[in-house]
Amino acid sequence: MFFTTGLVTDKGTVKEINQDAMMLKVAMTKEHGRIAFGLVCDGCGGLSFGEIASASYVRRMEDWFYNELPGILTNEDDTRKLDESSDNRYDPIELIKGNWTYISTQMNERLMEYGIQKRASVGTTVCMIIIIGREYLAMNIGDSRIYKYTNKKVSCITHDHSYVQKQMDEGRMTLKEAQISPMKSVLLQCIGAVGALDPYFSRGIIGRDESFLLCCDGFWRKTTPNDMVRIMNVSGYDKNSDLSSGKDLDNKIESVLKDHIEKLKYEGEKDNISAILIRARDAI
């Protein structure tokens, strides 16, 4: 796959500290060609504790990307060949899912201990995605989201862990009611603030040309469906342009994200605002 990407973060108009943290990696592998990995964390908690939580999770996942993922991709730790009952089908995506669950549980415990020491509530949401070959794996905890753009349509491939989402799932609240509810910011899952995590996973096949947008609630809350299509469509490839390096398109993506963030601030969004856009397409 060939990737064009952009990422932008802004502390917003009110908060003195940007409690969001994010990371984007694109790497060439021997076994799977180019892969892409991105995550957005939205820290919550008083003072700088939210910033600590989100940054700590991103650092842990950066360590995983460099030191643990290579072993999964090269299949060097696979022992199923010693098991005659095994069907010998190696599935790196499923192993990554297990890794992410374990790491999130580990970080949840560490941040809870830190919060106890500081006598404060410490936590962070997360949404992240990895693209390997023609497959993707997405995960979220909290209300940071991932949107997919394909065939000129946008869909959300994550599921909020929030009070209002649970009410909607159970048929007790409509979308319009959720959007104006005083409980709309209450989270039911957050790394560092719950006893047991229940990450939401989404796995799928990528077509010839698809885009993924990772964002915190400060980005998606006031973004309309038409805005989302406009933003994600900007990653479309123009055959008449010389963008073989992808650098011009990367800059264009970041410019559109920045412009939209300014629009959100003008419309009254006060939270930190962060987003990553990844376009995956067949190499030309």
Question: What residue spans do the PLM features occupy?
Answer:
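PP2C/PPM-type serine/threonine phosphatase catalytic domain
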Residues: M1-I284
